[in-house]
Amino acid sequence: WYSGMFAPNIKQEPISHHHHHHHAHHSYHQHPHDSNSNSNASSPHQSPLPSPNPPSNTNLQLEQYLKQQQQQQQQQQQQQQPMDTLCAAAMTPSSSNNDQNSPLMPPGLPNPMQSIMPANLRPSPTATTTTTPAAAAPTTTAATIALQANDKLQALTPPMDVTPPKSPAKSQQSCAEREKEHDLMSNSSEDMKYMA
C-alpha cells in the first residue's frame, strides 16, 4: 500500500493533487474504503505497469548504490593510503625515472635488477682485473658506465614496460578494479546479509 501510494506520489508530480485527493477522501469519509480500493486498484493495476516497480526498484538500486558509494568511500579511505602510495609509487617512477633513477626508482623494480645486474657484471670486471689491472680501470669504468647505462635502460625500460606508462594506468586500474571487485563482493555479501 505504501509503495502504491508512494509511487504515484513520486511518479506524477501531483503531490498537491495527491494531497487534495487524500483530503477529498478524508472529507468523504470514504477514506479507508476508498484509499483501500484505490491503492488496490493502483497497486495491482500499476505493479504490472512499471510504476511502483521503478520506484521500488530504483529505491532498491538507489539504496544499493548509496551503500556502494558509502562503501567505496570507506574503501577509498582505507585504501587511499596503501593505494595512494602504490599508485604514487607507480606514478613517480615515470617522472623520477626520467630524472635518471631518482631514489624513488621503484624499490620493487630495479633494485632486484640492480642486484642482479652488478652480480652479472661483477664477474666481468673481476675477470678483467685478474687479467690486467690496467685494463681493469677502463673495464670498471666501462662496467660502471654500462651499469649506469644499463641502469638507465633498466630504469627506463623495465619500468617503462612494467611501471610508467602501463603501470600507473594499470595499477590505478587494478586499484579501481580491485576496489570495484571488492566493492561488489563485499556489497553482494552485505546485500545478502541485508536481504536475508
Curated annotation (Swiss-Prot):
It is found in: Nucleus. Residues 125-144 have a biased composition (Low complexity). One of its GO terms (cellular component) is nucleus. One of its GO terms (molecular function) is DNA binding. Residues 176-196 have a biased composition (Basic and acidic residues). Residues 17-30 have a biased composition (Basic residues). GO terms for biological process: segmentation. Belongs to the hunchback C2H2-type zinc-finger protein family. Gap class segmentation protein that controls development of head structures. This is Protein hunchback. It comes from Drosophila silvestris. The lineage of its organism: Eukaryota, Metazoa, Ecdysozoa, Arthropoda, Hexapoda. The gene is hb.
